[in-house]
Amino acid sequence: MIRTLNIAHRGFSGMYPENTMEAFKKAVEIGSDGIETDLHITKDGVIVICHDETIDRTTDGSGFIKDYTYRELTEFNAGHGEKIPSLDELMDYMKDKNLLLNLELKNDVIPYENLERSTIDKIYEYGLKKNVIVSSFNHNSMQKVKKYDSSIKTGLLYGSPIHNPGEYAKRIGADALHPLFSLVMDKATINDIKRNGILINVYTVNEKSYMKKLIDLGVDGIITNYPNLLKDVIEKLTDK
Ligand code: G3P
Ligand code: MG
């Protein structure tokens, strides 16, 4: 029995415009176990979904999200005629599905003042506490989340090596580590993290050979642009 969770990175972003409702719905339709997505705050305090701090790369507009109102942002095309979604739209879609929702707070470049508090309020509003894991490259922010509510699950993102990651995560009170997958490709590292009681969700794994290796190593979740490929890999390993 393979228990590795299949988490769609920015939705099914390998085939549909990233971080759009289309990409989220396609991920759910093909049977992903969860969705990873990225959060920012508009000028008028609305949490919206986009990877970058600006809308230049992913829409037909330009400029910083923090300088637009939500209403203004909805005028832009995020691909296939899709709009930049609000967190409300995604949560409304997810609220009756028992799937994982990984909300990455994009507060490592712009320190959006109320992103933690506002995200937690949305989690309560939609009754999604048991489904959500909040993550960030900003580990101070994850400690702030725990101060507001210690029962909200948190994950520490990192893209370069850290010393004793399992012990570190435990010490600062996180539930999970979310490493760049190449940083945990050995059994000793995985075992060390698990010994500390910390979950491991790796990003971003788009090749089947790496998916197989990471499943074999026993990671808890794989974040991928191609949940269809990961589904294939899991099904084939299950058939054996
Ligand atoms: O949460 C995993 C992954 O999304 C972190 O990196 O830059 O794709 O948001 P990024
Ligand atoms: Mg992300």
Where are the model-predicted features located?
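Phosphate-group recognition and catalysis centered on beta-loop-alpha active-site segments
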Residues: 1-240
